[in-house]
From Swiss-Prot:
GO terms for molecular function: ATP binding; ATP phosphoribosyltransferase activity; magnesium ion binding. Its EC number is 2.4.2.17. Keywords: Amino-acid biosynthesis, ATP-binding, Cytoplasm, Glycosyltransferase, Histidine biosynthesis, Magnesium, Metal-binding, Nucleotide-binding, Transferase. Its cofactor is Mg(2+). This is ATP phosphoribosyltransferase. It comes from Shewanella piezotolerans (strain WP3 / JCM 13877).
Amino acid sequence: MSESNRLRIAIQKSGRLSKESLKLLKSCGVKFNINEQRLIAHSDNMPIDLLRVRDDDIPGLVMDGVVDLGFIGENVLEEEQIERQSLNKPSECIKLRELDFGACRLSLAVPNEFNYQDASSLEGVRIATSYPNILRRYMQQKGISYNDCMLKGSVEVAPRAGLSDAICDLVSTGATLEANGLYETEVIYQSTACLIQSTTSQPDDKQALINKILSRINGVVRAKESKYILLHAPTETLEQIVALLPGAENPTVLPLNDDTNRVAIHAVSTEDLFWDTMEQLTQLGASSILVMPIEKMMG
């Protein structure tokens, strides 16, 4: 692949998505030598360049075709798409898949002493947020007029600082809200990390590399959601035992040496095998039950 056809991937330079994005790429076999002082890193084993930038720059870089792929939170992507649509700028991209990290929600929250009944209680109040476009769309859908206070960070302190009456901010556990005397009232947007691709037409070799990376990501995510189960089972309760294995494909059943009344079962389960399920398996005569994580899956 020529230098101009190297795959360019944008990730957050630092923050909650940066570590997980790099970890995922590493799990896919992509090796980078990251220098914290440099914004561009070159893969050691694939024709891939990594651009480490501010998260709110990533959607625009993808939509403008500057980079080919981007790891981004859906909340940032949605906010930027609304902004670009209002300015008649390119706002299209291909969402290849959601990822299993970066889950959060964009919520309205008010001080503990606020007399909140429903969303209409926010009529005419000042709301601090870093997501004015998503907030505006939600409030317009509800038919509620309000005043906004745009902040780039520390939104949760705005009411105590006298800057706003309420806030619209990202929430993960709610602990930050509680620490600042606030409580969550409405969830207006659910978000997780996702992988997006530019709509720019790609050369065949670059698109093949994108497909390879996506296939590996699918395998890594699927493996994390799956477990490999091994156990010994009596032949007389085999059907009942197989039925108990959660989300399992057709298991492999193997004979045991010198024991015609028992078999070995190997299965991949796409759901958690809880303790109560293992206890039920034991009651049906299963033994030597092993539940192991899977590092990679394909096919």
